[in-house]
Amino acid sequence: MKETIAKSGLAATVKSVFSRRKFFGRAAAGTAAATTAMAFPAIARAQGPINFRFQSTWPTVDIFHEFAVDFTKKVNDMTGGELRIEMLPAGAVVPAFGLLDAVSKGTLDGGHGVLGYNYGKQNALALFSSGPAFGMDANMILAWHKYGGGKELLAKLYDAIGGNVVSFLSGPMTTQPFGWFKKPVTKTEDLKGLKFRTNGLAIDLFTEMGAAVNALPGGEIVPALDRGLLDGAEFNNPSSDRLLGFPDVSKVCMLQSFHQSAETFEIIFNKDKYNGLPKKMQAIIENASEAASADMSWKAMDRYSKDYINLQKDGVKFYKTPDSILREQLVVWDRIVAKKSETNPLFKEIEASQRAFASRAMAFDMDYNNNRRLAYNHYFRKS
């Protein structure tokens, strides 16, 4: 009997001890949870969303600025509002050609533009936007950039010039027209002394072909044509050209050219600001740039094809650039590339990398893909 009582007393004591431990354990856990619940909302409220101020190199009216805003919307949505990027138009903070410096210094947190606008800082930068591309289109350039070593070479270029930025190439452009003129250009000699606007390495191309080149940002081209400061100019595509007012000052547009047949956009972040972001946000930004790239190409196909028709309704006459001029462009490119490679080792390294990638990508593309002109003529141009 005593043994039973003793055991019962021991059991009760043990049970009491465990009960007290469980109570205090739960109480401690509850206190920690309460502390956590109070602490984390306070941190979240103190931090709030991260706000970045960006600027594009495009006027508000241009579809290019719309593409820039599309990218920021994707980032803002994908981060659930934790990162909010505001995209201002060209000139809101700095001129279009001043974007790289402004982002490097932190005056702006980032921007949307093209590498050709930085040609004056390092001519090899233009190989990513307005160079010969060795027959590649813009999608091939993006493929080379991501998988063929281009990304690493661009980072090397920025390090060489002290560019404090993180760069993402995004948005393949169509082949750009030869230009808008007062009358059709039928031979290379027609360019002699012509006051012409272009940018990037295409400056060298048109200069060697006889034109007097003036590099202007997109929003300044049509006013210069209207005032007679230019005799001809190129910008980019049916939508941009129409929105910027090209058909108001010219009714002649020459299609097809090798001066800018593979340009892409560039999205840049101030490196310090970008490196300060959580890794999750950095991953979102990279994926958003690629999502925006794909979406831009689809939107461009829809809008450009419509505005190509609208331009014709506006009275614009389109002419194919003569093959003799196209062949001359290729010959001139050979001379320019050889000359730049002699004096700029980085230019030579990037050019060689592009050329090697193009030699296999072009062969695959031409051998595997159809001549779509045959199908178009069959379905839509029956006599």
Walk through the language-model features, giving the residues of each.
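N-terminal secretory/targeting leader peptides
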Residues: 2, 10-141, 159-383
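A gly/proline- and charged-residue-enriched helix-loop-helix capping module
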Residues: 139-155
